[in-house]
């Protein structure tokens, strides 16, 4: 499966259903009155983390995802059915950004509400009053939220395997865990992070095999920096180093990887670390091991042969033991605080000599919610706009009979007594 760790997409909550206008028509029931039901709620969109997914590939080509709309209200005070919510499965460790601000960090086993659906509109039963026993008024359902998002995956693994190309990371992962990575005798066999679940005698944990690092990885060379970010949440860093091949220098390999980690993020050097000396089955292993111990006498080294699986079970238990004492680095990334901006209810913009536009979310939402389908609805909208000061502001702009006033998606023809829908 192709590894994709960053995608952009647009999510749209479902629209609420429209409220109904209807009246009781039953035998032996005089003056039955209104019985129009409310519209149903539009569907929300949730992200649900799944341990079985470790790529954003499924979302790469889903540029727009829409939740379902709520049903319209019906006669006999029947409410419209609320829409089913839309669940999108994502990998654990997915970061959700809107306008480059972090809004969610998917690290817990629960559903995350990302986009809300619209509310259902009221039916005419809700508008009944002592003064108006038969109202011809209703509401449209509101639109759902719309968000343009960037998703970035930072894999959640307990242990990160790092090393130079061809150090044996993929082979080790395949014998340690249930993972089946591609294995070859050439550099960069692993082109993307591979996750595996390891079960030791008394614990289980996840381990990630990161593509081989080369000098300059922290500056973007090779495959390095593209995947170094995936080690940021690992609690333990396990260096797998080739100690057996004649043309390899374990000391240089270790120092090179340390330097790339330091250049990328020096706090990575504070993590619990283990040296895994691989290729014990080769003849130069002991010589290289002795030289390494002299250079780094305080480092903990565990000897294995991933190819023959020698000491692999012992390594499983050792990693589990180290992990039980390691500090957690799975702190949730702090979300960016939302700045509350107080905006005007509306603003009048003169487009031409006889054309004006009223802009402002409160006003456009109001016009969207009140249908232009009955005289009473038109009067209700007119009164609300008047009470909010819209008409007074337009008069200041010398609006005249016959001029056009655009509000939201609608255009009204101005009349000194009342605006009528064009």
Curated annotation (Swiss-Prot):
The protein's Enzyme Commission number: 3.6.5.-
Binding residues for GTP: 163-170, 188-192, 209-212, 278-281, 305-307
Domain OBG-type G: start-end pairs: 157-324
Any one GO molecular-function label of the UniProt entry: magnesium ion binding
Gene Ontology, cellular component aspect: cytoplasm
Domain OCT: from-to ranges: 338-416
Cofactor(s) recorded in Swiss-Prot or TrEMBL: Mg(2+)
InterPro entries in UniProt: G_OBG (IPR031167), GTP-bd (IPR006073), GTP-bd_Obg/CgtA (IPR014100), GTP-bd_prot_GTP1/OBG_C_sf (IPR036346), GTP1-OBG_CS (IPR006074), GTP1_OBG_dom (IPR006169), GTP1_OBG_dom_sf (IPR036726), OBG_GTPase (IPR045086)
Residue ranges of every copy of the Obg domain listed in the record: 1-156
Source organism, top-level taxon: Bacteria
GO-annotated biological processes: ribosome biogenesis
Major localization class: cytoplasm
Keyword Cell cycle recorded: no
Top enzyme class: hydrolase
Keyword annotations of the record: Cytoplasm, GTP-binding, Hydrolase, Magnesium, Metal-binding, Nucleotide-binding
UniProt subcellular location: Cytoplasm
Biological function: An essential GTPase which binds GTP, GDP and possibly (p)ppGpp with moderate affinity, with high nucleotide exchange rates and a fairly low GTP hydrolysis rate. Plays a role in control of the cell cycle, stress response, ribosome biogenesis and in those bacteria that undergo differentiation, in morphogenesis control.
Family: Belongs to the TRAFAC class OBG-HflX-like GTPase superfamily. OBG GTPase family.
Subunit structure: Monomer.
Protein name in the entry: GTPase Obg
Organism: Mycoplasma mobile (strain ATCC 43663 / 163K / NCTC 11711) (Mesomycoplasma mobile)
Lineage: Bacteria, Bacillati, Mycoplasmatota, Mycoplasmoidales, Metamycoplasmataceae
Gene: obg
């Amino acid at each position: 499966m192709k590894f994709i760790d960053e995608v952009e997409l647009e999510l749209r909550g479902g629209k609420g259903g429209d409220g109904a206008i209807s009246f009781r028509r039953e035998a032996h029931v005089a003056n039955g009155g209104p019985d129009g039901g409310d519209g149903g709620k539009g569907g929300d969109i949730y992200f649900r983390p799944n341990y079985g997914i470790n790529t954003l590939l499924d979302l790469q080509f889903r540029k727009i995802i829409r939740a379902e709309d709520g049903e319209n209200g019906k006669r006999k005070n029947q409410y419209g059915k609320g829409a089913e919510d839309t669940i999108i499965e994502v990998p654990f460790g997915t970061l959700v950004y809107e306008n480059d601000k972090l809004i969610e960090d998917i690290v817990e086993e629960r559903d995350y509400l990302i986009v809300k659906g619209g509310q259902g509109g009221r039916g005419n039963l809700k508008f009944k009053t002592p003064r108006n026993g038969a109202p011809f008024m209703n509401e449209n359902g509101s639109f759902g939220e719309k968000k343009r998002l960037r998703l970035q995956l930072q894999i959640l693994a307990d242990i990160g395997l790092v090393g130079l190309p061809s150090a044996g990371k993929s082979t080790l992962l395949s014998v340690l865990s249930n993972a089946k990575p591609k294995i070859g005798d050439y550099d960069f066999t692993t082109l993307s992070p591979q996750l595996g679940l390891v079960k030791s005698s008394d614990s289980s944990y996840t381990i990630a095999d990161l593509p081989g690092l080369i000098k300059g990885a922290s500056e973007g060379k090779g495959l390095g920096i593209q995947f170094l970010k995936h080690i940021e949440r690992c609690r333990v860093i396990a260096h797998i180093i080739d100690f057996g091949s004649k043309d390899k220098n374990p000391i240089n390999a270790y120092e090179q990887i340390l330097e790339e980690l330091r250049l990328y993020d020096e706090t990575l050097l504070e993590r619990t670390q283990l040296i895994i000396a691989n290729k014990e089955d080769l003849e130069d292993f002991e010589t290289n091991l002795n030289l390494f111990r002299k250079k780094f006498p305080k480092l903990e080294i565990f000897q294995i042969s991933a190819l023959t699986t020698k000491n692999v079970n012992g390594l499983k238990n050792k990693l589990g033991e180290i992990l039980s004492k390691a500090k957690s680095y799975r702190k949730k990334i702090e979300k960016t605080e939302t700045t509350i901006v107080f905006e005007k209810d509306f603003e009048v913009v003169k487009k031409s000599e006889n054309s004006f536009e009223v802009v402002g979310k409160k006003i456009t939402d109001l016009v969207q919610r009140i249908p232009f389908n009955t005289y009473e609805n038109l009067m209700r909208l007119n009164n609300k706009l008047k009470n909010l000061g819209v008409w007074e502001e337009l008069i200041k702009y010398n609006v005249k009979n016959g001029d056009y006033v655009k509000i939201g998606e609608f255009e009204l023809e101005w009349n000194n007594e009342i605006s009528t829908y064009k």
